[in-house]
Amino acid sequence: MADPAAVTKYPLLGLLQSYQQPTTPPHRIPKPAPWAPVKVCGGRRRLLSDQEQSQSTETPTTPTSCCEATPWTVSTVGLSVQLHAQTKQGLSVVLQLHL
């Protein structure tokens, strides 16, 4: 038979013939792990001001090609920069950076 205190608190338990008071409390469900690691750095991305943007359009002082040992060239199209290089074995490598 059901515990009288439990039946008083939960009257529908009295309808169950096989109800017995649980001897151990139910196990707690563990808290799920976070989806992403906690962000340590609180820094925010800084937007460029109009003055800084106008300065970035100046011609770079970096050379656009190198010596014959490791030839490479730099080209720009809009907001993209491409670096073309070729190894001594003839392997061609292209690096494209979209700003």
UniProtKB/Swiss-Prot annotation:
Give the record's GO biological process terms.
Answer: symbiont-mediated arrest of host cell cycle during G2/M transition
The UniProt PTM text for this protein says: Phosphorylated by host ERK. The phosphorylation triggers a structural change that enhances keratin binding and protein stability.
Spell out the Low complexity composition-biased ranges.
51-67
- GO annotation, cellular component aspect: host cell cytoplasm; host cell nucleus
Q: Where the protein is mainly located, per its record? A: host cell
Q: Where in the cell is it found?
A: Host cytoplasm; Host nucleus
Q: Does the keyword Phosphoprotein apply?
A: yes
* InterPro entries referenced in this protein's UniProt entry, alphabetically: Papilloma_E4 (IPR003861)
UniProt-annotated stretches for the region Disordered? 48-67
Keyword vocabulary terms for this entry? Early protein, Host cytoplasm, Host G2/M cell cycle arrest by virus, Host nucleus, Host-virus interaction, Modulation of host cell cycle by virus, Phosphoprotein
Say which family it is in. Answer: Belongs to the papillomaviridae E4 protein family.
Spell out the note in the miscellaneous section. Answer: The major E4 form is first synthesized as an E1^E4 fusion protein from spliced E1^E4 transcripts, such that the first few amino acids of the E4 protein are derived from the N terminus of E1.
What does this protein's UniProt record list under function? Contributes to multiple aspects of the viral life cycle including viral genome amplification, suppression of suprabasal cell differentiation and egress of newly formed virions. Induces host cell cycle arrest at the G2 phase by associating with and preventing the nuclear entry of host CDK1/cyclin B1 complexes. Inhibits cellular DNA replication by preventing loading of host replication licensing proteins MCM2 and MCM7 onto chromatin. Within the cytoplasm, associates with host kinase SRPK1, a splicing factor regulator, and inhibits its activity.
Can you state the subunit structure given in the record? Assembles into oligomeric complexes. Interacts with host CDK1. Interacts with host SRPK1; this interaction may favor expression of late viral transcripts. Interacts with host cytokeratin components KRT8 and KRT18.
Q: What is this protein called?
A: Protein E4
Give the organism, scientific name: Human papillomavirus 31
| Gene name, Swiss-Prot/TrEMBL | E4
